[in-house]
C-alpha cells in the first residue's frame, strides 16, 4: 500500500491537460459580450476517479486519458500566486490510512476523512470555530502580513499576461470560508444567533484581500476575480437571499469595486447546485460569471440567458449525465443548449462537472464530434 503524505496526492491521478487555444483578449471580449467571433468550448474538470481506468480498458489513447487528444477552444488561466485566505496553515498530517479511506489533520487544523474510492473532497469530522472566542484565536491567520506576497509573484503575473493567459486572482468564498471554519449547520445558526461572528470573519477576510489585491493591481492588471463557494445542493442554496444581502454581498462588493476600478472585467463564482434563488443578489454584488451551471440541479443556461441577458456569463452548462444515455439523448441536449448560447456569446460551453463513471469512451468521442458540428453550423450564421 502506497502511503501518501498529502491529501492532494490522492487526487493527482485526476489531472488533465489544459491547453491554450485563444488569447486572453478574445476570451474577455466574448465573456463580456463585446464580441462574438467563434464559440468557446472546454472540459472544466475532467473525469471522476476510476473513469480513466475504464477508458483505458476501452482502448483510449494516452491523449484521450489526459484529454489532450480532444478538440476544445478555450483560454489558459494564469493565477497570480498570492495568498488572500488562510495564512500560516497548520501542518497537514496523515493520521490513519486504509485501502478505502484516509483520515488526516488538514491545514485548518480539522480532522477530515477522504474516500479513496471516489473523487470526493475530504469531509471534515470537526471544525475549529464555534464561538467568537474560537475565531479570535484563529483570526491572526486571516490578517494581513507581508508574506502573503512572498515569492516572485510579479514575474509570474507578467509572464501570464505576456503569454496571453487570462490573469486571475482568487479570494476566499463569502459562504465557503466561514463554512470551512464552522461547518454548514453551525454557520446556518450563526447567521441568526451570532451574526457579529460571521460579520467579523468576512470583514477580516475582506480587509486582507483588499490590501493584497491593492498591491497586486498596482503592478499588473488582473483580468478576472475568482471565488469558490460550492454553496448549493439540488434543492437550493445553503444561504438564502437575505443572508447573501446581509453578509456576503458587502464582502463581494468591497473586493470587486477595487478590482473593477483597476481594470478587471470578470468576477466569476464556482458553485455547484441550484443557485437560482440567489442569482439576483450576487449580480447586485458585482458577480458577472457563474459556473459550472449544473442542469441536474435546475441550472438551465438557456432559460437563464433569456432571463439575465448580458448581465451574466456562463461556463459549463451541458449535462454530464446525458453522456451515459443514448446518442439521440446526447444530440438532444446539445441541440437545446448550443445554438442559443452560440448566438448570444458570453459562454464557454462544457460539461457541468466531472465526467461520471460509466461514461463510455465512444460516447465522449461522439459528444465532442457532435458538439463541434453544431457549434460550427451555428457559428457560420453569426
Predicted region positions:
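Short, surface-exposed linear segments at secondary-structure transitions and domain or protein termini
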Residues: 120-132
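Segments that shape or occlude catalytic/ligand-binding pockets
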Residues: 51-92
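Active-site loop segments of alpha/beta catalytic cores
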Residues: 3-46, 51-57, 102-105, 114-118, ...
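A structural signal for short, hydrophobic beta-strand segments that form beta-sheets
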Residues: 92-96, 119
Amino acid at each position: 500500500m502506497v502511503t501518501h503524505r498529502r491529501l492532494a496526492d490522492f487526487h493527482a491521478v485526476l489531472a488533465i491537460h489544459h491547453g491554450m487555444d485563444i488569447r486572453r483578449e478574445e476570451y474577455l471580449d466574448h465573456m463580456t459580450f463585446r464580441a462574438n467571433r467563434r464559440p468557446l468550448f472546454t472540459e472544466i474538470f475532467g473525469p471522476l476517479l476510476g473513469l480513466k481506468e475504464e477508458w483505458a480498458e476501452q482502448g483510449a489513447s494516452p491523449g484521450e486519458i489526459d484529454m489532450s487528444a480532444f478538440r476544445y477552444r478555450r483560454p489558459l488561466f494564469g493565477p497570480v500566486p498570492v495568498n488572500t485566505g488562510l495564512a500560516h496553515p497548520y501542518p497537514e498530517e496523515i493520521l490513519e490510512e486504509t485501502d478505502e479511506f484516509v483520515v488526516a489533520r488538514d491545514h485548518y487544523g480539522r480532522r477530515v476523512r477522504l474516500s479513496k474510492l471516489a473523487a470526493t473532497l475530504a469531509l471534515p469530522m470537526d471544525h475549529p470555530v464555534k464561538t467568537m472566542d474560537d475565531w479570535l484565536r484563529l483570526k491572526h491567520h486571516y490578517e494581513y502580513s507581508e508574506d502573503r506576497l512572498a515569492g516572485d509573484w510579479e514575474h509570474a503575473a507578467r509572464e501570464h499576461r505576456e503569454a496571453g493567459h487570462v490573469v486571475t486572482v482568487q479570494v476566499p468564498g463569502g459562504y465557503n470560508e466561514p463554512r470551512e471554519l464552522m461547518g454548514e449547520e453551525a454557520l446556518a445558526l450563526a447567521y441568526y444567533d451570532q451574526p457579529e461572528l460571521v460579520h467579523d470573519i468576512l470583514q477580516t477576510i475582506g480587509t486582507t484581500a483588499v490590501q493584497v489585491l491593492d498591491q497586486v493591481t498596482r503592478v499588473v492588471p488582473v483580468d478576472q476575480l475568482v471565488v469558490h463557494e460550492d454553496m448549493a445542493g439540488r434543492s437550493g442554496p445553503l444561504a438564502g437571499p437575505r443572508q447573501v444581502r446581509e453578509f456576503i454581498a458587502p464582502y463581494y462588493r468591497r473586493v470587486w469595486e477595487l478590482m473593477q476600478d483597476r481594470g478587471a472585467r470578470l468576477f466569476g463564482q464556482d458553485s455547484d447546485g441550484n443557485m437560482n434563488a440567489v442569482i439576483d443578489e450576487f449580480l447586485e454584488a458585482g458577480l458577472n460569471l457563474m459556473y459550472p451551471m449544473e442542469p441536474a440541479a435546475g441550472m438551465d443556461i438557456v432559460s437563464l440567458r433569456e432571463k439575465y441577458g448580458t448581465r451574466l456569463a456562463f461556463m459549463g452548462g451541458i449535462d454530464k449525465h446525458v453522456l451515459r444515455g443514448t446518442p439521440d439523448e446526447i444530440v438532444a441536449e446539445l441541440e437545446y443548449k448550443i445554438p442559443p448560447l452560440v448566438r448570444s456569446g458570453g459562454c464557454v460551453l462544457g460539461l457541468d462537472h466531472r465526467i461520471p463513471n460509466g461514461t463510455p469512451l465512444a460516447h465522449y468521442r461522439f459528444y465532442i464530434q457532435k458538439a463541434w458540428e453544431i457549434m460550427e453550423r451555428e457559428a457560420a450564421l453569426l
